[in-house]
Amino acid sequence: ETTKIFSLFYKVQDYFKSYMDTSSLLSLEFRRFIQEGKYKKNQIAYFDRNSNKATIQNKKIDITNYTQDVISALYACRTIPNEEIIINDTIFIQVYNLEKKEMFNTYFVPIKKEKIKTKLFGEINTIKCHPHVQKNRIFSDKDETYIWVTDDQYHVPVKVETPIQVGSIYIEIIDAENINYKF
């Protein structure tokens, strides 16, 4: 969501909800509510894991056993064991694109281990990752998105930086409640 001042020029309120199987972390349902300037769109995708089909607005497409939505993909990546994360190695993920109603293959690359300072956690050891982000109305064609995750078994995303069509987005966790995690 954009700040009040920025909203005077270009309001962005995008909400994503992912319902997933808690053991496999595979998508069962994905909801996307978009407001970007004057553009508005609400979409829901249902994933039938028994028939390997995804449905959106009565259109069915084939999916694989490993197809994710953008949120469940992040959770699935967090389960990769530390010993399988190799700096500069490419990790591939298949994601369902609601807007185009199709599958696309994407990837991310762990670039380096880095100690960063955050408002909530202070100095923390992280792995800086470079995910491939598809160009759209918000994201520019510059492939310069970075995500920092904790360098531990949990891989908590603590910071994101990405260029957009009209500037850049910086995301950082500034508060957390009811978590059982020691940084």
Give the location of each predicted region.
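Hydrophobic, well-structured mid-protein blocks that either form specific transmembrane helices
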Residues: 38-84
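Acidic, serine/threonine-rich low-complexity disordered tracts
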Residues: 1-47, 85-183
